[in-house]
Amino acid sequence: MINRNTENQFKLVSKYAPSGDQPQAIETLVDNIEGGEKAQILMGATGTGKTYTMSQVIARVNKPTLVIAHNKTLAGQLYSEFKEFFPENAVEYFVSYYDYYQPEAYVPSSDTYIEKDSSVNDEIDKLRHSATSALLERNDVIVVASVSCIYGLGSPKEYSDSVVSLRPGQEISRDQLLNALVDIQFERNDIDFQRGRFRVRGDVVEIFPASRDEHAFRVEFFGDEIDRIREIESLTGKVLGDVDHLAIFPATHFVTNDDHMETAIAKIQAELEEQLKVFEAEGKLLEAQRLKQRTDYDIEMLREMGYTNGVENYSRHMDGRSEGEPPYTLLDFFPEDYLIMIDESHMTMGQIKGMYNGDRSRKEMLVNYGFRLPSALDNRPLRREEFESHVHQIVYVSATPGDYEMEQTETVVEQIIRPTGLLDPEVEVRPTMGQMDDLLGEINARVEKGERTFITTLTKKMAEDLTDYLKEMGVKVKYMHSDIKTLERTEIIRDLRLGVFDVLIGINLLREGIDVPEVSLVAILDADKEGFLRNERGLIQTIGRAARNSEGHVIMYADKVTESMRKAMEETARRRQIQMAYNEEHGIIPQTIKKEIRDLISVTKAVTQDKEEVVDFNALNKDERKAMIKKLEGQMQEAAEVLDFELAAQIRDMVIELKNM
């Protein structure tokens, strides 16, 4: 068992002081948390500095904090920002460690069994271990996670109880240490020294923790006593310093002691016998044979190795849980008094709700056809109500909070004023009759001023027809549809910003990375057609695309004003009035955001800050493409090593697309 250090304090580092209505938002959120309020909403308009406000709140309340985002990219962006704000504290990153993941599945219509296939990202696996070990060691921890944090993880008690604690002067033989390391799933490898491994050289044992990537530890023995513990560079063996105490956490999150393992194996065998009887009674002899063969193999592996592929499917037995009981997750590694912040909650809470059902239907198929025992159903994500039971205090963060969040709390803290003084755009409704000619005139007016235009349509056909029409009228226009790959998409956005073309047409322009300060006009066609993209939240998000420019303007083309349109316009006008009053009172003149145009599709050496090298990928021959892939993979590794996961993911997408060219 390891004792958590609760004395560390969060220390926020920033050259900016809170401005606009950030001070009021921070004060209200902190007062409510300290007053014991369970749930509240931070409703912050686009570009108002919500992450900075979140950081200020974390520093003030000084609680371990879990920040959940709805995808890896956004989690990576938040992680980078929090690392900058809290350089002296433990800012951790916990997302799915699969670069590629094909879950185990069975398709009865074609009698196809799809074995689990995955590629584990070693860097992310390290960071996951770093997150869980930090949560057990200290209090000043921020974990930025995707919704994978509600998936089953091993028992935190078993994980904590399995920690091997070492100190100079401690009486323990070398062989006892080696056995202890094997028990927590470390591998002995005297040649290839990597994370989760140890090597032995006489009376010296070198251990490479699962949560590290550069530094390892050297334990020197004198007889049956530890003489000295040193931190070393894993590659060179260079000594970095002496260590008074070393805690070695297990190399896997699914770990159990020998007694619990025997009990678990007995339960697995008993369940197997029960399920075989069920299959035989139903005449499912093939399923029975399949299940017995697979389970017997897994039991043998658990007995001999303490581990098997797919061990998580037996986690209910290994954790000692009852049928239907929720699994342990990352949330169980936090102390009781912790804070949850849900970023883009209108998206993230929907994901949390939907995870359980999708997982359940796939696993039921595996159980029904003899690929897994029924207990595999309890290796699952949390249901939403189970997630709610883990909530001590929570802040939902969104420009457009969903109905669920609004039902949870009446406490809504607004953040409307932008530090740049920028206003929400003016919004007007125009009739659909003659909309093409009207829109053409508006576009030409923007082109003359060197500004750009977004047009959002509801159908692919309308987008294509509009693109053709505008091209005939001499407008430089492009259409961005869902089939466009990442590489092309980033190139299109860059070309729009540079003025290679002036108008971008799309169906859903709400995706992250579409904030373009040069866009002063957003045109919404078929604004009165109710649906996902034309509901109140969708419209507010689309309107926000024009909020980065001081000349921001939105035109909705519609024959009637729907309830969603009315609410979106009223909310935008309300925010705009507040922003204008603040600017007038403080003498602020709105300034368009000056955002550097990064050559996203060029081979950027961002890690070393060298100058950019622009490459036309389409002009490369086969050998040049191979060389480029190798070069990019090196840069991807460098980006990951300095924790710039956003860039690493971008480069990874380029590599994938280059391989497919």
Curated annotation (Swiss-Prot):
ATP binds at G44, A45, T46, G47, T48, G49, K50, T51. The keyword Protein biosynthesis does not apply. Residues 31-186 form the Helicase ATP-binding domain. GO terms for molecular function: ATP binding; ATP hydrolysis activity; DNA binding; excinuclease ABC activity; helicase activity. It is found in: Cytoplasm. Residues 626-661 form the UVR domain. The beta-hairpin motif is involved in DNA binding. The gene is uvrB. One of its GO terms (cellular component) is excinuclease repair complex. One of its GO terms (biological process) is nucleotide-excision repair. The UvrABC repair system catalyzes the recognition and processing of DNA lesions. A damage recognition complex composed of 2 UvrA and 2 UvrB subunits scans DNA for abnormalities. Upon binding of the UvrA(2)B(2) complex to a putative damaged site, the DNA wraps around one UvrB monomer. DNA wrap is dependent on ATP binding by UvrB and probably causes local melting of the DNA helix, facilitating insertion of UvrB beta-hairpin between the DNA strands. Then UvrB probes one DNA strand for the presence of a lesion. It comes from Streptococcus suis (strain 98HAH33). A motif (Beta-hairpin) lies at residues 97-120. InterPro entries: Helicase/UvrB_N (IPR006935), Helicase_ATP-bd (IPR014001), Helicase_C-like (IPR001650), P-loop_NTPase (IPR027417), UVR_dom (IPR001943), UVR_dom_sf (IPR036876), UvrB (IPR004807), UvrB_inter (IPR041471). This is UvrABC system protein B. Residues 435-601 form the Helicase C-terminal domain. Forms a heterotetramer with UvrA during the search for lesions. Interacts with UvrC in an incision complex. PROSITE patterns: HELICASE_ATP_BIND_1, HELICASE_CTER, UVR. Keywords: ATP-binding, Cytoplasm, DNA damage, DNA excision, DNA repair, Excision nuclease, Helicase, Hydrolase, Nucleotide-binding, SOS response. Belongs to the UvrB family.
